[in-house]
Amino acid sequence: MSKIAIVDYGMCNLWSIKSAIQFIGYDSILTSDPKDILNSSAIILPGVGSFKTGMDNLLSLGLSQAIIDACMFRSIPILGICLGFQLLCCSSEEPSYTKGLSLLPIQIVPLCRHIDASFVLPHVGFTSVYTSKNDPLFKNIANKSDFYFVHSYGAFNVPHDFTTYSYCNYDAKIISSANVNHIMGVQFHPEKSQTNGLILLDNFLSFSNV
């Protein structure tokens, strides 16, 4: 039976994600068991808060290796949301240099490094997202649709050969999402992004064949 695993590592209110998934017609489980991750059909890694705390929690629960093995050796699709997206990346400087899961070749840095002091940080609220053609996450979503953000750290660059990513403009171009095959991440919160967010979640789960 197909199983959607929402990773519970103590970093956010998971019920908003679970409720959104239920609203669009899917069942899911909240889990901190590595076996559930490895035996799932799709993984959702949400999160709010400190990158270092998030990685420490994943490591202490045995979830970091389970996520890597599930994605790299079993090709299980994963969607990282907000902090979850950042944890999929190579590293973050929050609060100091910390290694991530290294499933996406991206570095996370403070927004204030590239954004003028006249702009309010953290970046909070609905912001238009500029999408790539043929991105499965944004199927049936118009380019420059609004999604809900809340973050103080983010990515400003992706590798030159990346063809599937999106960005928003908040004084500087901030990476809003990035995909490498079945490994996907979004900086915004789809569960707080109204209809567009629900469509995006449905797109991910349809891509995952759950």
UniProtKB/Swiss-Prot annotation:
Q: What is its main location?
A: cytoplasm
Quote the pathway field: Amino-acid biosynthesis; L-histidine biosynthesis; L-histidine from 5-phospho-alpha-D-ribose 1-diphosphate: step 5/9
InterPro entries from the UniProt entry: Class_I_gatase-like (IPR029062), GATASE (IPR017926), Imidazole-glycPsynth_HisH (IPR010139)
What are the protein's UniProt keywords?
Amino-acid biosynthesis, Cytoplasm, Glutamine amidotransferase, Histidine biosynthesis, Hydrolase, Lyase
Domain Glutamine amidotransferase type-1 residue range list: 3-210
**One GO molecular-function annotation for this sequence?**
lyase activity
Record-annotated active site: 82, 189, 191
As for subcellular location, the record says: Cytoplasm
Q: What cystine pairs are annotated?
A: none
Top-level division of the source organism's lineage: Bacteria
Q: Which reaction does it catalyse?
A: 5-[(5-phospho-1-deoxy-D-ribulos-1-ylimino)methylamino]-1-(5-phospho-beta-D-ribosyl)imidazole-4-carboxamide + L-glutamine = D-erythro-1-(imidazol-4-yl)glycerol 3-phosphate + 5-amino-1-(5-phospho-beta-D-ribosyl)imidazole-4-carboxamide + L-glutamate + H(+); L-glutamine + H2O = L-glutamate + NH4(+)
Q: Which PROSITE patterns match?
A: GATASE_TYPE_1
What are the GO cellular component annotations? cytoplasm
| Entry EC no(s) | 4.3.2.10, 3.5.1.2
CDD domains to which the protein is assigned, alphabetical: GATase1_IGP_Synthase
GO aspect biological process, one term: L-histidine biosynthetic process
Q: What does this protein do?
A: IGPS catalyzes the conversion of PRFAR and glutamine to IGP, AICAR and glutamate. The HisH subunit provides the glutamine amidotransferase activity that produces the ammonia necessary to HisF for the synthesis of IGP and AICAR.
Q: How does it assemble?
A: Heterodimer of HisH and HisF.
What name goes with this protein? Imidazole glycerol phosphate synthase subunit HisH 1
- Organism, by scientific name, is Parasynechococcus marenigrum (strain WH8102)
Which gene holds the coding sequence for this protein? Answer: hisH1
